[in-house]
């Protein structure tokens, strides 16, 4: 939604050198600590070694207590995976987590481990124990740094801002800001010109404004306008493209809202009507049929968990600008 993955990957490409190795892994598909350890070891071995012999040597040197099962494809340098046969309660896990530090020492370099969709670890069984183990090992490493990022803001916030969790204040938190309109205008117009088409500054700006500068939506809407443009983008091209973006996202919005309770839908209706705080006043409770003050808290937590609302500067908002328009049409708000 915000382009964080592409930003991190671009930074990785720029920073990579003989003295700084970058390891990137996406753990979205990991459903257990065992999945994580397999993915972690595979990524570290693969992305810090330039030859098959080298990562096989590193396995022998640094994973001596483990008998990993190695699967190779046609290209062993890019197509291989590791399955670790280990006892989760033994020191073998620490051996895996220490792998990047030991490789960095051997190579005389520093390593940055970039882990995408890091919030997945909150879903693991005995997650808090798992988190404690990661932090206890990682915080003592001297040559390895960690860039941990994810797409579910409320879960990431909880992992790093909840005092009772192991990763509390583990590092500096960076919240990505939206890309500025001026930068988007130059980018959009440049992409049109590269294909012998034109779009005015005003229309490019309108694309940004209509979707509140959300990276994925700006790119999607600009692309839809581009498809409809013959030579010069028109207002009609823009309006048709905007309807397209609503239509294309309607199935997703329907799926996200079909199981909502009446209270939850009423809460969203209140936001659409301009209520962003003080939901527990008698006037708001009665007008939008939200039940009791306690019920409002339950509804709010549920909608935050579903990522349908967010809290920004103590104001409750619907963060998705296209969904906002769709909801208004559906609810007649």
Question: Which sequence ranges carry the predicted segments?
Answer:
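Conserved Walker B catalytic segment
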Residues: 82-152, 161
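Short regulatory helix/loop adjacent to the ATP-binding pocket of P-loop NTPases
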Residues: 153-171
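Alpha-helical DNA-recognition elements
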Residues: 14, 224, 302-305
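Conserved AAA+ ATPase "SRH/arginine-finger" region at the nucleotide-binding site
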Residues: 172-183
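An amphipathic alpha-helix signature
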Residues: 34-41, 181-189
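P-loop NTPase nucleotide-binding core
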Residues: 2, 6-112, 294
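Amphipathic alpha-helical "lid/sensor" segments that cap RecA-like P-loop NTPase cores
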Residues: 185, 189-252, 262, 313
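C-terminal leucine-rich, beta-strand-based interaction scaffolds used for sensing/assembly
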Residues: 247, 251-333
